[in-house]
């Protein structure tokens, strides 16, 4: 009991986990304290009385027995140098004002006309020859070649598919005459 009065933090050591204490402290524990760690079912009803008897020490008593860490002291004045431990936040540069982009109509001073480049040039001779279907030998040829069907295939369109652009393909055998629509 006398050892408990000298060290006010022994209250926490008695009920703390075994991993937090050192092996030297575990060797010095009296049998009473070890029996106190394991709660007996008979004493569990009277546990409230035991807690009332064991109270934490007051702050004055606690700080008389506990030593303060050395890094808090200024060796010349033997007082805590709080200014040395103050950490200041880094200063942020002033933010530049940026105009929000929104859907409102901008003032007339800020109007700018968008300059669109001309579309890629189209050879008008090719366009006119396509319009008037003047595709003779002397007509200018378009750089893009039309994709032709492979030999032996021709497209068939049914009456139902005249409106649609899809068409059916069927293979034509070399000896078979081509069928015409009725």
Swiss-Prot record:
Source organism: Homo sapiens
Phosphotyrosine modifications at: 132
Keywords: Phosphoprotein
PANTHER family: UPF0690 PROTEIN C1ORF52
The keyword Phosphoprotein belongs to this UniProt entry's keyword annotation: yes
Residues with the Phosphoserine modification: 158
GO molecular function: RNA binding
Gene Ontology CC: one annotated term: nucleoplasm
Tissue: Expressed in all tissues tested including heart, placenta, liver, skeletal muscle, kidney and pancreas. Weak expression in brain and lung.
Ranges for region Disordered: 1-67, 100-182
Protein name according to UniProt: UPF0690 protein C1orf52
Similarity-based family: Belongs to the UPF0690 family.
Basic and acidic residues compositional bias, start-end: 50-63, 172-182
InterPro entries: DUF4660
Record's compositionally biased regions (Acidic residues): 23-32, 151-162
Modified residues (Phosphothreonine): 67
């Amino acid at each position: 009991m006398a050892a408990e009065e000298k060290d006010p933090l022994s209250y926490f050591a008695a009920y703390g986990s075994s991993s937090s204490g050192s092996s030297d402290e575990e060797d010095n524990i009296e049998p009473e304290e070890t029996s106190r760690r394991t709660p007996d079912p008979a004493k569990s009803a009277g546990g409230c009385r035991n807690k009332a008897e064991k109270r934490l020490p007051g702050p004055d008593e606690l700080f008389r027995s506990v030593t303060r860490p050395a890094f808090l002291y200024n060796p010349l004045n033997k007082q805590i140098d709080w200014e040395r431990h103050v950490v200041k936040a880094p200063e942020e540069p002033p933010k530049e004002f940026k105009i929000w982009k929104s859907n409102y109509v901008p003032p007339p001073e800020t109007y700018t006309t968008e300059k669109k480049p001309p579309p890629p040039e189209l050879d008008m001779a090719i366009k006119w020859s396509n319009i008037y279907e003047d595709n003779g030998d002397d007509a200018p040829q378009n750089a893009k070649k039309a994709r032709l069907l492979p030999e032996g295939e021709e497209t068939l369109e049914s009456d139902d598919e005249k409106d649609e652009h899809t068409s059916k393909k069927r293979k034509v055998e070399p000896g078979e005459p081509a069928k015409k629509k009725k």
